[in-house]
Swiss-Prot record:
This is Antimicrobial peptide LCI. Heat stable. Resistant to proteolysis by tryspin and pepsin, but susceptible to pronase E and proteinase K. GO terms for cellular component: extracellular region. It comes from Bacillus subtilis. It comes from the Bacteria. GO terms for biological process: defense response to bacterium. Its main location: secreted.
């Protein structure tokens, strides 16, 4: 699973927990048309 998180300054947490699911930061890109950064998170797998 993938989650996209918006940030105006490009600063993203290395990970966060939402509803008991841990998400790990993978990469980010700048959306020039909207004027903010988008961080890409993936679900952390306990395996």
């Amino acid at each position: 699973a993938i989650k996209l998180v918006q940030s105006p300054n490009g600063n993203f947490a290395a990970s966060f927990v939402l509803d008991g699911t841990k998400w790990i930061f993978k990469s980010k890109y700048y959306d020039s048309s909207k004027g903010y950064w988008v961080g890409i998170y993936e679900v952390w797998d306990r395996k």
